Amino acid sequence: MKNFKYYFVMMVLLVFGTLPAYAADKEGDQSHKHGTWQEKRFVAAVDADGIQRAEMVGGDYFYDPNYIIVKVNIPVELKIKKSAGYVPHNLIAKAPEAGIDFNIDLKGDPQTIKFTPTKIGKYPIYCDKSLLWFKTHREKGMEGLIEVVE
């Protein structure tokens, strides 16, 4: 009987503990399904010190901007921070062949990612976080591109 009470209490806590995240998950899902997601481009200019700089915010199933254009073979500093909220997010790019390879958990304070793109092309960025059995944040629209141009 003790075990039953323990497991019952644990199940209740689990269910009610995940409801807020489930609601946030569904809300983000609906906004993406209804087409509110839109591409937001940013072209990084080369500063006087020879570095391309861009700033990005990641939040509930979005990156802003979500499409960053940089020049090949010129160092990039991408400053990113997480908007307010309790849902964890990250920023991933997996293109080591192009000098773009990072996986960073987003925080409220800005973090700087440094890389030098070495190959022209379009490279996906995304968040792979998810809660239990729900869709990943990428599947819910938290993705974008880094485009490397001449």
Regions found by a protein language model. Give the residues of each.
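N-terminal edge beta-strand
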Residues: 44-75
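Boundary at the C-terminal end of the N-terminal hydrophobic targeting segment
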Residues: 21-25
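Beta-strand-rich interaction surfaces with strong enrichment in secreted/lumenal proteins
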Residues: 65-68, 100-105, 113-115
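Bacterial N-terminal signal peptides
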Residues: 9-18
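Extracellular/periplasmic metallocenter environments
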Residues: 29-49, 54, 105-150
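Bacterial N-terminal signal peptides that target proteins for export
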Residues: 1-8
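Non-cytosolic beta-sheet module surface loops
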Residues: 58-60, 80-84, 117
